[in-house]
Design a protein with these regions (language model features):
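Active-site loop-to-helix junction immediately N-terminal to the catalytic Tyr of the SDR YXXXK motif
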Residues: 155-164, 175
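Active-site helix of classical SDR
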Residues: 129, 165
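Catalytic Tyr-X3-Lys loop
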Residues: 90, 102-126, 141, 145, ...
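C-terminal helical subdomain
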Residues: 182, 189-190, 207-274
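Canonical Rossmann dinucleotide-binding motif of NAD(H)/NADP(H)-dependent dehydrogenases/reductases
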Residues: 2-33
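Alpha-helical segment proximal to the catalytic Tyr-Lys
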Residues: 134, 178-179
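Conserved amphipathic alpha-helix within the SDR
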Residues: 46, 50, 56-59, 64-79
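Conserved glycine-rich Rossmann-like NAD(P)H-binding loop of the short-chain dehydrogenase/reductase
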Residues: 28-44
Length: 274
């Protein structure tokens, strides 16, 4: 199947990383189901790129949604879902806009803030992946690409709830890759490799916007992962900043990639004999 016949469902598609990835995929002939809670942002995306029948917006708030219903609506519109990009995220700005200068202690985070981050950054990945994966398995081809964050961000003080919720997504990605091994459906992670110039970084942040990474940093690893060259690549995480455009794609992927999570530190528990 050619790119022009592949359909991508991408969450958080109205702005930031999701918008850049969606546009990049549209430009290469993919059909894109753009999911976001921001209806105006989805309209603006369509106005920017046109794309005719290749682009359709779906309004959904991932803190409270029916994943099976959303997947069915996308399949009804496009016929199938070949690629799922779990990109939507809630950052630390929901706790307080100046979190870079004054990182919140975990006990300063409200239960609602915790629940919202877990809902979007972790639960939605599980729910949507579960909703779309069985037809992928039946077709013996599929891609699930999860956007997490740096391992350091997951663990350092002041990162609650963003860091722990992304750590959950990272661990889930590793489990999903193992569960789907040999099915033709791959699971991989992409991260930018640093702070990115998106609305997730509040205006109060002490950064010059042009000094931040730009959202298009995600495109080289993404476009490689959805290509036939990556048919047998699963359980890996790729840093956009480490992708070397001067190398051949496979060599660039080798340089930018590593196993998902922290497998080099993992020791499997001793299992009782049966």
């Amino acid at each position: 199947m050619t790119d022009s016949n592949r359909t991508v469902l991408i969450t958080g598609a109205a702005q930031g990383l999701g918008r850049a990835m969606g546009i990049g995929l549209l430009e290469r002939g993919f059909s894109v189901a753009a999911v976001d809670r921001d209806a105006n942002g989805l309209c603006a995306l369509r106005e920017q790129v046109g794309a005719g029948p290749k682009l359709e917006g779906f309004v959904a708030d991932l803190t409270d949604f029916d994943a099976a219903k959303l997947a069915a609506e996308v399949e009804q519109r496009f016929g199938r879902i070949d690629i799922l990009i779990n990109n939507a995220g809630i950052g630390q700005g929901q706790v307080r806009p100046d979190y870079h200068a004054h990182p919140p202690k975990f006990y300063e985070v409200t239960p609602r803030q915790w629940s919202r981050a877990i809902a979007v950054n972790a639960n939605a990945i599980f729910l949507l992946s579960r909703a779309v994966v069985k037809p992928m398995i039946d077709r013996k081809w599929g891609r699930i690409i999860n956007i997490t964050t740096s391992l350091g961000t997951m663990l350092h003080g002041g990162s609650t709830p963003y860091g722990p919720s992304k750590a959950s997504a990272e661990a889930l990605s590793s489990v999903m890759a193992a569960d789907l091994e040999g099915t033709g459906v791959t699971v991989n992670v992409i991260i930018p490799g640093g702070a990115v110039n998106t609305p997730m970084i509040p205006a109060e942040a002490p950064f010059a916007r042009d000094a931040l990474l730009q959202p298009e940093v995600m495109l080289p690893p993404l476009l490689w992962l959805v290509s036939p060259a990556a048919d047998n690549v699963t359980g890996k995480r790729f840093l956009g900043t480490s992708w070397d455009a001067d190398l051949a794609s496979d060599a660039a992927a080798e340089k930018a990639g590593a196993p998902i999570g922290w497998k080099d530190l993992a020791v499997l528990p001793i299992k009782p004999a049966f």
